[in-house]
């Protein structure tokens, strides 16, 4: 496949830079209760961010030790440093697009904080989202180069809730094209995402971009979607907490679907506390998503409050133990099994009763817990295009009939896909729904849901424990073993860090709980996490140099909190070079295409816009401009 790179450059004017600087200078000097103060404000520095949790970042922001601008610049610096090839590493290729408005949004949120306004529990926190979440200010590609300029008018419900809670949407992450492959992340829009624990290995999929990015410290947390393993798989293989909630607890409105019978939205984080916090923001009824009618069955407002390091005491947990065959292409079976055995002993040490579940067999999973999805993919994608107000790429809809409607077939006809021919054939074999085959599959899946619910009751279980993946990440494969349990039945599941093999490959413990017992599952997960603390950050993406605190000017806020930033027009694309990144040998080769964060506003390690604000207020800036560089490549 040949690639023609496109580069789009968005330049902010000197006036915009000045406004941002003044807004930030206001944010750095909160008003005294007795009027103006002449005392210097505390120095602000860009903090170390490797494994910085959301709760850690909030504490720094609340104390005034850092600002959202400094924090955002720090994360953008990491994307710039590690996403494209560097040193002897191929780079992660985890980000499709860094938000050109991230720094200006951060400055606005800093000003709001200084003025005493806090939007919500994520105020000023940068968050990553998978590139199938619609965003009003950035294109949504679902990993397809053909959708490079597909721009929705509105945010997805999940992104809307993040923004309402005060989050900064930092970047859109790479994904398996149309979320199809769950063992690797490869897209025509960005190429292959690599695992930061060993960049020769797969990052799993389909949310591998979010997984690799969060693991590497591009942001404290991110969102993925999961149809069968796409949150828990990348989380297990990159030592993260990956939470797949009860089906219907979180809205999927505005997310490019794969199979709506199984699609969920959920968090990928470095701590259980952060996962619980994000679930409080994401969970809840959405009138545009009928499946969320079940969201009101549980109180999702106290997930964090309910976390306890004694939650496992007295819990009855079934340990699923199957025999597996050694496969040279999927290494680590023996060591992963030992790690999961130890994880289960750790559950017991925290007071859980571990019981065998001999009736939870392969046959029970394959014959009873069946999927009703994968017969609705093509029609569901077509429905998304038909019902989502968006600007389509020029000429794309006219490639197939009907010429006035954008369809999955149009995207495939454009010829830029990384999907295999047999994948495309399977998508397009899906008949319009309803149809008899689909109705029969749904009926069988509904019966499996009842059987799963009854299994928990009959065995008096609070949870099931199993390996997220029985084997380790490899160059061509990093999958899951038990994704069917949550995906096909809709019960909540979580992958938790369970240690590392002798080769440094991460392992994950998967827990599944009864339907709508999300609070209990999060609490049990927290107890296990606090007792084990397995997570270690990857060595291939170390902390960047941290500068000494930068003295900040003293000023009173002179303006009301700034409005939501508008999207700036972008310049015409220009060509850039395309780095070559190894792709899995068993899958179509596609080079990782260059991305870019917002350009640095100073030397490496400075506080970016904070330093710019200081220079502006001090009168030494003149006509400075911020340059936001966006580089993505389109296949042709």
Go through each PLM region and give its residues.
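Structural helix-boundary/capping segments
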Residues: 216-321, 346, 488-553
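Glycine-rich, small-residue loops and helix-cap segments
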Residues: 64, 124, 422-549
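Short, well-ordered alpha-helical
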Residues: 37-141, 145-148, 179-182, 294-295, ...
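Short glycine/serine-rich loop/turn segments
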Residues: 85, 122-265, 290-293, 320-322, ...
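Short helix-loop capping/hinge segments that flank enzyme active sites or metal/cofactor-binding pockets
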Residues: 123-142, 311-320, 375-450, 497-506
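C-terminal membrane-anchoring or membrane-association module
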Residues: 613-636
